[in-house]
Curated annotation (Swiss-Prot):
GO cellular component: early endosome; endoplasmic reticulum; endoplasmic reticulum lumen; endoplasmic reticulum membrane; intracellular membrane-bounded organelle; membrane; membrane raft; nucleolus
Transmembrane segment boundaries: 56-76, 81-101, 111-131, 179-199, 204-224, 225-245, 260-280
Keyword match Transmembrane: yes
Annotated disease: Ceroid lipofuscinosis, neuronal, 6: An autosomal recessive form of neuronal ceroid lipofuscinosis. Neuronal ceroid lipofuscinoses are progressive neurodegenerative, lysosomal storage diseases characterized by intracellular accumulation of autofluorescent liposomal material, and clinically by seizures, dementia, visual loss, and/or cerebral atrophy. The lipopigment patterns observed most often in neuronal ceroid lipofuscinosis type 6 comprise mixed combinations of granular, curvilinear, and fingerprint profiles. Ceroid lipofuscinosis, neuronal, 4A (Kufs type), autosomal recessive: An adult-onset neuronal ceroid lipofuscinosis. Neuronal ceroid lipofuscinoses are progressive neurodegenerative, lysosomal storage diseases characterized by intracellular accumulation of autofluorescent liposomal material, and clinically by seizures, dementia, visual loss, and/or cerebral atrophy. CLN4A has no visual involvement and is characterized by progressive myoclonic epilepsy.
Subunit organization: Interacts with CRMP2. Interacts with CLN5. Interacts with CLN3.
GO biological process: cholesterol metabolic process; ganglioside metabolic process; glycosaminoglycan metabolic process; locomotion involved in locomotory behavior; lysosomal lumen acidification; lysosome organization; positive regulation of proteolysis; protein catabolic process
Molecular function terms, GO-annotated: lysophosphatidic acid binding; protein homodimerization activity; sulfatide binding
Entry keyword set: Disease variant, Endoplasmic reticulum, Membrane, Neurodegeneration, Neuronal ceroid lipofuscinosis, Transmembrane, Transmembrane helix
Species of provenance: Homo sapiens (Human)
Mutagenesis or variant effect for residue 241 to T: In CLN6; decreased protein level, resulting from ER membrane-to-cytosol dislocation of the protein followed by proteasome degradation
Coiled coil, from the record: none
Name assigned to this protein: Ceroid-lipofuscinosis neuronal protein 6
Localization in the cell: Endoplasmic reticulum membrane; Endoplasmic reticulum
Organism placement in taxonomy: Eukaryota, Metazoa, Chordata, Craniata, Vertebrata
Lipid bilayer topology: Multi-pass membrane protein
Length: 311
């Protein structure tokens, strides 16, 4: 009886277990508590380096490797070297994202994290198939700066229902695959970013190694935003991050080194996208392919129009 009353007394007066439980509930409901702000994580140099390296090699380098390696090594009816890069990306990236979430000083909702990872893998896998076929069509004269129906190798196909099939393939590649790939990707990064705050302004600094990674990281995200045609998703994520920074600043909480690195990378990306759009603003051919209000040409469309056509 005495032991029971002692446990009840501890629970009522806020013993260690109760305090931990309260802290956990606060974290689950999205607010950065004082305890969480005090648990500032060191800069994850290893994860950010691996993350940036595999993005450049396995994602950006994927179509380049497909064009560089001899066609005899990877026949058109077999997976290309770029496809194997994509397969590796689909395995390594979710693993790195999970490791990043594990190192967050804030307790993040596991169910949302796991569902996001599952959808990410599904979307990236859908994109793997569609992108593989679309890039293999380059060897047959397919031009990325034209729409599917305007491409010389497709517009005269018989029966015409075959054109519908290629448009469906393009839809899975450029729309459904990208949405299921990038929405959970940016959601996970934002959830991680929401825990990157510290109560100490002295810890709100970017270390030297992080500064060296900002440029390649921001440049990769520029490629991701332009080639993936996800400017709206990116700008929404960036302004959500900015709003969170301003909101936490009122509570005297500041971005830690990891948060500053991610925010700086996104800010550089926004600048590069603006310069890219300004440079190609008056291109009549690309304007025809991207007629909407949001005009963000794809790098590969620029390549097939202005680079490969000269050779």
């Amino acid at each position: 009886m005495e032991a029971t009353r002692r446990r009840q007394h501890l629970g009522a007066t806020g013993g260690p277990g109760a305090q931990l439980g309260a802290s956990f509930l606060q974290a689950r409901h999205g607010s950065v508590s004082a305890d969480e702000a005090a648990r500032t994580a060191p800069f994850h140099l290893d994860l950010w380096f691996y993350f940036t390296l595999q993005n450049w090699v396995l994602d950006f380098g994927r179509p380049i490797a497909m064009l560089v390696f001899p066609l005899e090594w990877f026949p058109l009816n077999k997976p290309s070297v770029g496809d194997y890069f994509h397969m590796a990306y689909n395995v390594i990236t979710p693993f790195l994202l999970l490791k990043l979430i594990e190192r967050s000083p804030r307790t993040l909702p596991r169910s949302i994290t796991y569902v996001s990872i599952i959808i990410f893998i599904m979307g990236a896998s859908i994109h793997l198939v569609g992108d593989s076929v679309n890039h293999r069509l380059l060897f047959s004269g397919y031009q990325h700066h034209l729409s599917v129906r305007e491409n010389p190798i497709i517009k005269n196909l018989k029966p015409e229902t075959l054109i519908d099939s290629f448009e469906l393939l393009y839809y899975y590649d450029e729309y459904l695959g990208h949405c299921m790939w990038y929405i959970p990707f940016f959601l996970i990064l934002f959830m991680y970013f929401s825990g990157c705050f510290t109560a100490s302004k002295a810890e709100s600094l970017i270390p030297g190694p992080a500064l060296l990674l900002v440029a390649p990281s921001g440049l990769y995200y520029w490629y991701l935003v332009t080639e993936g045609q996800i400017f709206i998703l990116f700008i929404f994520t960036f302004f959500a991050m900015l709003a969170l920074v301003l909101h936490q600043k009122r509570k005297r909480l500041f971005l830690d080194s990891n948060g500053l690195f991610l925010f700086s990378s996104f800010a550089l990306t926004l600048l590069l996208v603006a310069l890219w759009v300004a440079w190609l603003w008056n291109d009549p051919v690309l304007r025809k392919k991207y007629p909407g209000v949001i005009y963000v040409p794809e790098p590969w469309a620029f390549y097939t129009l202005h680079v490969s056509s000269r050779h």
